[in-house]
Amino acid sequence: LILVERLIPFQETSEGFFDMFDVVIQLGAILAVVVLFWNKIWPFYLKKNKQPKKGGIVKSAKDPAVGNVALSMDAFWMWVKIVVACIPAVVYGLLFDDAVSEAFKKEIGGSGVTIQVIVVAVMLVLVGVLFIVIENWNKNRVPTTTKLSQLTYRDALIIGLCQLVAAALPGTSRSGATILGAIMIGISRTVAAEFTFFLAIPVMFGASLLKVLKFGFAFTGMELACLLVGTVISFIVSLFVLRFLMGYIKKHDFKV
């Protein structure tokens, strides 16, 4: 998005709008995650429904319940681990995000090219190369974690630190960084991808809220239209991409 905006700059928008836009439209992708993985992320269920839907949350007779509504402890502890993984990004966002963002906006020697653009270009290539290198290194290893329930708090924190790299360096894929980190510590591709997508739910909602608050809700009609269209397109595209990706990585690696 940062590189595209350099080629096709937004017209008739307020200062700082694009910084907010490229974060907020990702809510469309997060909504796609919620829709596709609802059976795995929603921890409550009706006790009368004894058989879980295929690929849904794990149900147990020991799960606490109020009346006919029970709480899947398996799903509950998954969300606790997601909170642990969010801690590095939350600390960074509150303390350093503004300062780092301003530093990356500085031009290089009056050339009109910002540090941000250079970092984005470098990180796009570097992350792609890392996927190839790490997949080659990982090809003969057997994953030690093949279920979400097997993730430890240590695993969650390491994945959260990988996410921090993506938050600090523009152009670094958040999903790419966390999936690579997860694979390196012995987590299967499917579990790595699922946990990464679930982790994005609170992170991107929080990041979007923070950006909108800083922008001040002072949208023009054009800006509001851009946000709505961008978010809807993000949602539709993500539905297809996520379905394809989850099916693809069950049989293939990320080297393509």
Locate the predicted segments by residue:
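Multi-pass membrane proteins that catalyze or facilitate reactions on polyprenyl-/lipid-phosphate substrates
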Residues: L1-V256
